[in-house]
Amino acid sequence: DANTNPWGYKLSWSPSSLIGASKRTARVLIDEKEILWPDGETYENVFLYDVPDLGVFEAYANADSTLYKKGYGIPEAKTIYRGTLRYPGWCETICYLNKIKFFETDVRPTKGMSIAQFTSIQAGYPGDPREALCKRLGLEPWSSFILRMEWLGFFEDTILPFESCSPRDVISLLFDKKLVFGPSERDMVVLCDEVVGEYPGGKRKQYKSTLIDFGVPGLWTSIARTTGVPPAIAVRFILEGKISTPGLLAPMSKEIYEPVLEELKNEGIVLEETKEYV
């Protein structure tokens, strides 16, 4: 209900972390074959994913999925894919931004330079930034990417507040300015798990778990609650002696995830589960 901009995204966490993820390398296991997508290529390998009651999202691989094979003790797994969901259009936008190297960290002098001038220089053509991007990327002025760039402020004559900066600094500045929640708006976190098991005789059964959680305006964001409450519960369990294994642990053992998931129900963080033969 707060999806009110052409980017289909608002920030309830660090802009720099979101931007850093745009260059992240991803690795997945598909049909027993490892596939590596370096330097943001994962955004070029996207598929559509339907979430009941919410609609269709884009899904793309996030970081190294193959680690879960050992972590969860499932050496027989043929496919392991950890992905991120976004509203349609996000991956196209990130791909174009990667092509014009707007996520790079090379610093250059920008004293007295406008955002529009910076955009033209980054696109490699002097003059109008819209025309520069269209020439560089082979797009029409009315394309969705160009319209998103206009809305975010890339074509404005506003002077950059830096004597020197990188392309990443500019996009972070605009993200922080425009991709924000209003005081009465709430964020949403969606988590979907799918596990398909094959049984003797060839029968295959699919297990699905879905979490849809919303923040509360003026109190907390969903991203803060769903990432902060689980480790807080784990800390309490350590103090109570319910978790006794020493060291820095990922929540991949039953000693950790079973009691934490059970306690999360009391906080209203619940995954709805379904299963069916496929």
Each model region followed by its residue ranges:
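C-terminal catalytic/substrate-binding lobe primarily of soluble NAD(P)-dependent oxidoreductases
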Residues: 1-278
